[in-house]
Design a protein with these regions (language model features):
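Conserved ABC ATPase "signature" region
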Residues: 44-59
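Conserved ABC ATPase signature
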Residues: 64-68, 72
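Helical segment within the ABC ATPase nucleotide-binding domain
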Residues: 104-117
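ABC ATPase NBD coupling module
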Residues: 1-13, 27, 39
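H-loop/switch region of ABC-family ATPase nucleotide-binding domains
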Residues: 125-126
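Hydrophobic anchor residue at the start of the ABC signature
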Residues: 78, 90
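Q-loop/switch helix immediately C-terminal to the Walker
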Residues: 18, 25-41
Length: 160
């Protein structure tokens, strides 16, 4: 990918709606994360540093993607993209396959981590409550709406 506006291709990272798509099934999570770190010139120690921030146990790295919970896998997917130090995270329905408690944990973690790492989040969501709780600015798309750069409460009120 070419540099756009002076940013490296790794400046933009996607947090998958289905975290299973972020990991090869045949490889341990630790090996996948180590490969990502190496490919992007990051020390593998960054993996260990991010694990506790994301509430993850190091033992998870010895497992394959199918052997961890959905919430754990989504947090590991977040760790995966944070390894490359993105400037923008494109989060496409990042909580859609999670139970309500895990949804809140993952979105809170995403927002806290993005703030700590100094990156922006582009959140795609069909959940007005989630948008109201997390967004500073909203672009609402639909048959009756194409509102750009308006505050979240105004758009959420119009959507309900």
């Amino acid at each position: 990918m070419e540099k756009a506006a002076g940013l490296a291709a790794t400046a933009f990272q996607k947090l998958y709606q289905d975290p299973v798509a972020a990991f090869p099934r045949h490889q341990t999570l630790g090996r996948t994360l180590a490969d990502v770190a190496r490919r992007h010139g990051q020390p593998e120690t960054r993996i260990e540093a991010l694990l506790p921030r994301l509430g993850l146990a190091p033992a998870l790295l010895t497992r394959r993607p199918g052997a961890v919970s959905g919430g754990e896998l989504q947090r590991l997917a977040l760790l995966r993209l944070l390894l490359v130090r993105p400037k923008v995270i494109f989060a496409d329905e990042p909580t859609s396959r999670l139970d309500p408690i895990t949804q809140k944990q993952v979105i809170d973690l995403l927002c806290e981590t993005a703030t700590a790492e100094g990156c922006a989040i582009m959140l795609v969501s069909h959940d007005p409550a989630l948008v109201a709780r997390t967004a500073d600015h909203v672009l609402s798309l639909g048959p009756d709406a194409a509102n750009a750069d308006v505050t979240a409460p105004r758009v959420v009120g119009a959507l309900q």
